[in-house]
Amino acid sequence: MTDAARARMLETQLIARGIRDAALLDAMGRVAREAFVPAEFAAEAYADGPLPIGAGQTISQPYIVALMIEALALRPGERVLEVGAGCGYAAAVLATMGARIFAIERHAALAEAARARLAALGLAVRLRVGDGHAGWPEAAPFDAILVSAAGSAVPEALKRQLAQGGRLVIPVGPPGGQTLLRLTRRGPERFESRDFGPVSFVPLLRGVGAAG
């Protein structure tokens, strides 16, 4: 059943909406999304919408995950920082595509569960609890940065951690007015911007989440 649901998701939600990256489609066809959602939502894992994962967070709908990753324009072996790892699904897709993943999650319980899922799948992802606004400076620079929460603006620390030619994909704006942006670094202080349209994400908060 899940293989069939995954195949339908690829055809009706991704390919039908213009997702063309072959490596991305292959990875999303291989990663078991149902392993990344709470058991009570497993039957809805391939539904065309977000699902709650705890701590007030969600796993984005499959199309939005695909849109953001395709916007990164990844090449095999690139170093990628994910801010807002959540349940670990996007990190799993990125790692399956051959990227070297560094992931940050502000909620310790989500990070611990994601780490366990990724390890069980044999995926090498470095994941730590931290404030996504700060990025991961000691591991920088990154070829790509994916931010899975909406900022009021693009955090300057993340821009500084982007390699020359690197791409940063982030939703920006207030609730009800967010847009998905890609910044490509063209020089020390020069960034080229592209708008990928309206989206809706949980906010990118500062600090780490409270325990419990």
Swiss-Prot record:
Which residue positions are annotated as catalytic?
S60
Catalytic function, reaction form: [protein]-L-isoaspartate + S-adenosyl-L-methionine = [protein]-L-isoaspartate alpha-methyl ester + S-adenosyl-L-homocysteine
List the PROSITE patterns hit by this protein, alphabetically: PCMT
Give the record's keywords alphabetically. Answer: Cytoplasm, Methyltransferase, S-adenosyl-L-methionine, Transferase
Q: Name one GO cellular component term.
A: cytoplasm
UniProt keyword annotation of S-adenosyl-L-methionine present:
yes
List the disulfide bonds in this chain: none
The primary location reported for this protein is cytoplasm
Q: Which domain of life, per UniProt?
A: Bacteria
State its role: Catalyzes the methyl esterification of L-isoaspartyl residues in peptides and proteins that result from spontaneous decomposition of normal L-aspartyl and L-asparaginyl residues. It plays a role in the repair and/or degradation of damaged proteins.
Q: What is its EC number?
A: 2.1.1.77
Q: Which InterPro entries match?
A: PCMT (IPR000682), SAM-dependent_MTases_sf (IPR029063)
UniProt GO MF annotations: protein-L-isoaspartate (D-aspartate) O-methyltransferase activity
What Pfam families does UniProt report for this protein, alphabetically? PCMT
Against PANTHER family, the record matches this protein to: PROTEIN-L-ISOASPARTATE O-METHYLTRANSFERASE, PROTEIN-L-ISOASPARTATE(D-ASPARTATE) O-METHYLTRANSFERASE
UniProt-annotated location(s)? Cytoplasm
Annotated source species? Methylorubrum populi (strain ATCC BAA-705 / NCIMB 13946 / BJ001) (Methylobacterium populi)
Gene Ontology BP term (one): protein repair
**Name of the protein in question:** Protein-L-isoaspartate O-methyltransferase
What is the similarity comment for this entry?
Answer: Belongs to the methyltransferase superfamily. L-isoaspartyl/D-aspartyl protein methyltransferase family.
